[in-house]
Amino acid sequence: VMACYNAMIPHIVTDLPELQASALGQQMKSPLIYTTVGLRQWRAFKEQGIGLAMSPGNLHQTVFMDFPVSSGGYRYTQGPDEPCVVQMISCPYSEVLGKPRAEQYREARYQMLGTPFSAYEEEVRSHLGGMLSSDHFDFDRDVASLTVNRWAHGYAVAGPGDSVAIGRQPHGRITIANSDSASEADAIAAMQMGYRAVTELSV
């Protein structure tokens, strides 16, 4: 069972039928940025009633309070004067709209990887400072940590037409899985594709 970035499979399995190799080569992954902001307190979010904010036009299109999960010796924040984590998500895109999707992802990927940490920090400062009231939020006082996680090849995105279905066909003793073969970027799809791939194995 090959459960990897599906576009790489033709480079590993070099005797694939041309149609299948071409279909796998058309699968894409969008770039993705997950920024984690550690706050010393989150009273500004509480006072403004913000749990999640959609921010079109900003680098980070989604901002939300982290999920209230306690595990082991860790317990999630119990009140707005305690530390918490805020997640900021960005799905970068090309500055030139209307281009083919693959080109937009490529341009966004290069721009994302070429951006220094200081620029991300300044964007988060501006974003949160513009969204939250200065009565309860001061970036320098309230932000304890900032982590920017960049994935050049983040979420699976379907290629054109039937390329996903064609690409995931068994080849000899090889079956193909991973979320790429469902063109959905989540664990459930990955497990479903893994199950499918195992059932396709010839005994």
Q: Can you annotate each of these PLM segments?
A:
Residues 2-55:
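Glycine-rich loop(s) and the adjacent beta-strand/alpha-helix scaffold that form part
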